[in-house]
From Swiss-Prot:
Key word Kinase present: no
Ranges for domain 4Fe-4S ferredoxin-type: 2-30, 38-67
GO molecular function: 4 iron, 4 sulfur cluster binding; metal ion binding; oxidoreductase activity
Binding site for [4Fe-4S] cluster 2: 47, 50, 53, 57
UniProt entry keywords in alphabetical sequence: 4Fe-4S, Electron transport, Iron, Iron-sulfur, Metal-binding, Repeat, Transport
Top-level lineage group: Archaea
Cofactor section: [4Fe-4S] cluster
Matches recorded under Pfam families: Fer4_7
Cofactor binding, per record: Binds 2 [4Fe-4S] clusters.
Naturally occurring in which organism (per UniProt): Methanocaldococcus jannaschii (strain ATCC 43067 / DSM 2661 / JAL-1 / JCM 10045 / NBRC 100440)
Protein name: Uncharacterized ferredoxin MJ0146
Ligand binding ([4Fe-4S] cluster 1): 10, 13, 16, 20
């Protein structure tokens, strides 16, 4: 599974960090080109694919790609 944040869409609202029940995301410690600290998936192995982050993201910046096993 691969969790991606599209930094072109993300505005750094941190909703994904707040709504994730498993603590998958943290705020990056580095500014991106837009001058924000985007969320990063630091614990992707904890993701249960509940899609709360995707559903709550106002900018549709999050995608989860399921690996074909």
């Amino acid at each position: 599974m691969k969790i991606e944040i599209n930094e072109n869409f993300c505005k750094g609202c941190d909703i994904c960090i707040v709504v994730c029940p498993r603590g998958v995301f943290e705020k990056s410690k580095k500014l991106n080109k837009k001058g924000i600290y985007p969320p990063i998936p630091v614990n992707p192995e904890k993701c249960t694919k509940c899609n709360l982050c995707i559903l709550q993201c106002p900018d549709q910046a999050i995608s989860i790609e399921l690996s074909q096993e």
